[in-house]
């Protein structure tokens, strides 16, 4: 008989020398400032940022949603540490002008805080 065990997810830490964004609820690192694409997005709870890549984030199942810019297939993303829903990942854009968002991540400002080197 094979015993199934749940593997432990280890938290990623971004370098201290870079400006980073962290989960406001548990302070887990989420993204490096260098991965920020745009500050001009709207989430369900207010302003949001678009990132090229993130860390310490889990992804739910994709579903089609009509957003401000049209129909997209998106998956909710959550903090792996505290399980708070942070925003979503763009899986597929149906409009050709929105294709640049595919594979990118939205994190709402209500769920993140600036950490490290923001003097």
Curated annotation (Swiss-Prot):
InterPro entries for the chain: Yippee, Yippee/Mis18/Cereblon, Yippee_fam
Sorted keywords for this record are:
Metal-binding, Nucleus, Zinc
Q: Read off the Pfam families from this record.
A: Yippee-Mis18
Nuclear localization signal (motif): residue ranges: 99-104
Q: Respond yes or no to whether keyword Zinc is given for this record.
A: yes
Membership in a protein family: Belongs to the yippee family.
Listed name of the protein: Protein yippee-like 1
What is the organism field in this record?
A: Homo sapiens (Human)
